[in-house]
Amino acid sequence: MFPLKKSLLLLFFLGTINLSFCEEERDVDQDERRDDPGERNVQVEKRLLRHVVKILEKYLGK
């Protein structure tokens, strides 16, 4: 019974953290919408480029 409670508590905790990150991301997106649309596109491209570079470094090595 205890391992089951422990697992459920862990899932609840991780779900809460994930929800918190989603809310923060949504708040950031709402702030970006108030800015110039062209500026927002540049910010999104920079974020995307950063993730692509990390993935390429992971597979190709440094």
Curated annotation (Swiss-Prot):
It holds the Pfam family FSAP_sig_propep. It is found in: Secreted; Target cell membrane. GO terms for cellular component: extracellular region; membrane; other organism cell membrane. The modification Leucine amide is found at L60. Expressed by the skin glands. Keywords: Amidation, Amphibian defense peptide, Antibiotic, Antimicrobial, Cleavage on pair of basic residues, Fungicide, Immunity, Innate immunity, Membrane, Secreted, Signal, Target cell membrane, Target membrane. GO terms for biological process: defense response to bacterium; defense response to fungus; innate immune response; killing of cells of another organism. Residues 1-22 form the signal peptide. InterPro entries: Frog_antimicrobial_propeptide. It comes from the Eukaryota. Residues 23-47 form a propeptide. Antimicrobial peptide with amphipathic alpha-helical structure that acts against both Gram-positive and Gram-negative bacteria and the fungus Candida albicans. Is active against S.aureus ATCC 25923 (MIC=2.5 ug/ml), S.suis 2 CVCC 606 (MIC=15.6 ug/ml), Salmonella ATCC 20020 (MIC=15.6 ug/ml), P.aeruginosa ATCC 227853 (MIC=60 ug/ml), and C.albicans ATCC10231 (MIC=31.25 ug/ml). Is not active against B.subtilis ADB403, E.coli ATCC 25922, and K.pneumoniae ATCC 700603. Also shows a strong antitumor activity, but no hemolytic activity. Belongs to the frog skin active peptide (FSAP) family. Temporin subfamily. This is Temporin-La. It comes from Aquarana catesbeiana.
